[in-house]
């Protein structure tokens, strides 16, 4: 029987044009503040990219492989519930404690939060910066 290497390769590495367009959007629109990077997807962006909020959050690790960032996030708008979902990932920074302050939680290096307004994003970033600064001092 054996393993079909070609099929395995395709399953692991082949991507769609939609993946390319989404990744391009993220690279063109991400923001940064110190060791933190994030992208924001409004309902309009999600519609234009033909994706759900869940799919929007699933691209969070597009920003994972940059050495300058120890925390990276996906912020997606939820107009229906009038809030913003934040997926937070990190390399060595316990982000779940910060996520818990914003109606969320999760694992130490992979957590989620819910913001009632984009103004809260600034506060979330400041709390994450405090965590990062505590590690690097």
Where do the protein language model's features map onto the residues?
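Hydrophobic helix-and-loop "lid/oligomerization" segment in the mid-to-C-terminal part
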Residues: 1-137
């Amino acid at each position: 029987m054996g393993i079909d290497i070609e099929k395995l390769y395709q399953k692991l590495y082949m991507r769609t044009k939609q993946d390319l367009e989404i990744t391009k959007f993220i690279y063109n629109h991400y923001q940064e503040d110190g060791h933190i990077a994030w992208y924001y997807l409004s309902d309009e962006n999600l519609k234009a990219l033909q994706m759900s909020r869940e799919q929007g959050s699933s691209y969070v690790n597009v920003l994972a492989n940059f050495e300058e960032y120890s925390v990276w996030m996906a912020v997606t708008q939820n107009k229906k519930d009038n809030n913003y979902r934040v997926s937070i990932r990190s390399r060595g920074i316990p982000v779940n404690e910060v996520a818990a302050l914003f109606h969320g939680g999760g694992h130490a290096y992979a957590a989620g939060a819910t913001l009632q307004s984009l103004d809260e994003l600034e506060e979330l970033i400041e709390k994450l910066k405090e965590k990062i600064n505590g590690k690097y001092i």
